[in-house]
Design a protein with these regions (language model features):
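Membrane-embedded alpha-helical signal segments
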Residues: 1-155
Length: 155
């Protein structure tokens, strides 16, 4: 039910990911989160304790926040947190991703004032740059495959 609300709130954006592990649900924005951190802080702990899972005892990370209601979930997701919930508990864990190639100053627009970020070859990094500046649930992206030979992923 929470995931359906989030999917509706984020307007079916393609980087909103959902996984279910042993009655525990995991939701995160792929463009803002590190898959390595998700594996280390969340997935390893959930898959090791298959019989009896208590979220409060099994999730570790640099910043874990226990939530009481639905209101602040989108704020946390847009700031690089993953949502972990089951029937009893709901919490977020910081799994903010690191940028792959450094974001450089654009060479073609050297006289423009303001932030000096530029896009690179990674779709996820570019989405992350946009979503870190524009923290809104109605910012939606959709993935496509273009080209007959190269089949490039565009968003």
């Amino acid at each position: 039910m929470i995931y359906k609300k989030l999917k509706k709130e984020f307007k079916n954006t393609s980087d909103l990911k959902y996984k279910k592990i042993n009655k525990v649900n995991l939701v995160y924005l792929e463009s803002l989160c590190s898959s390595n951190k998700i594996n280390d802080y969340i997935l390893k702990n959930l898959t090791m304790n298959k019989k009896h899972i208590m979220l409060r005892d099994n999730i570790s990370g640099p910043s874990v926040v226990y939530l009481e209601d639905y209101k602040s979930i989108s704020f946390y997701l847009l700031n690089g947190f993953a949502l972990i919930y089951d029937d009893k508990d709901m919490l977020v864990c910081e799994v903010k991703g690191d940028l792959y190639r450094s974001v450089n100053i654009p060479t073609s627009e050297s006289s423009v004032n303001g932030p000096k970020d530029s896009f690179n070859e990674s779709i996820l990094m570019n989405l992350g740059l946009i979503k870190r500046r524009v923290k809104a649930t109605n910012l939606v992206n959709e993935d496509f495959i273009l080209g007959k030979r190269t089949k490039n992923k565009v968003s």
